[in-house]
Amino acid sequence: MPPMISFRHFSAAPWSSSSLSTSKSSRIFLAKLFLGFCLVISQITTACGDDETHPTLDSIRSSLIRQEDTIVFGLIERAKYPTNTPLYNNTSSRFPGTLFEYFVKRSEALQSKVGRYLSPEEHPFFPDDLPPPLFEPKSQSIEQFLHPISLNVSHEIWDIYLEKLLPLLAKKGDDENYAVTASSDLQLLQALSRRIHCGKIVAEVKFRDNPDKYKEAIRGQDRDALMKLVTFEAVEEKVKKRVAKKARVFGRQVTLEHTDNATETYKVDPPLVSRVYEDWVMPLTKKVEIEYLLRRLDD
């Protein structure tokens, strides 16, 4: 049986003001959460392309390249902490599910109120019973650009992250810094989800650029044909090389002494970052593209 969670950071009630005020870890968590909400506000109407009304493949690719920075930095941030498995495995009578699930549900509920999920590329991991936003978006042009299809692969992203990526990214151990660990997890998960769900916009742009080429495969529900149409191997190779290079640049250990490149160490392994894109990010993005296209001609 795994060890029980230490609730020394959450005495009395997990979110009581008295417990939070005495916990350095919790104060850090609140500061990061507040910053996250500020970022949410700035991204509410941000689509995957620079031009929300008429995104192009070039504008979308520019956005995806910028999102690489967020994901690489997110991987570096999460790699700072050990696996902290009690965060994901143990439950308590104080809340349903694991501590991480509780953290994500409460965070998503608050982020829903400030409008995070008004953007078509933003999808919650726990969509049930989310509160409505406190305001209406100024513009929904990107939603009008897309075909009205409900598509969400967040659960698949969640499972891959916890079961496959996290064991490769974090060293084994438990430092009991569950608040900051959960915060870095959620920021990385949301960055991955946003990038992957941009596949809907990518698919729509590709369809509009050459509808006749896609319609035949869509009418025949031919997944293999659609996979060939949405796959650009040369582009994918560039992406893998670029994110690995970013991991080397962003994750370099900076010292005042001269360091031999052969012995240089990084905060996150560059080949792992490349693998994240090769094994999970790009395949899931193409899955979103194909699922979207298969229903593109539906009334």
Features from the language model and the residues they span:
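N-terminal chloroplast transit peptides
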Residues: M1-L33
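Cleavable N-terminal signal peptides of Sec/SRP-targeted secreted and luminal proteins
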Residues: A31-S42
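Extended amphipathic alpha-helical regions
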Residues: I41-D299
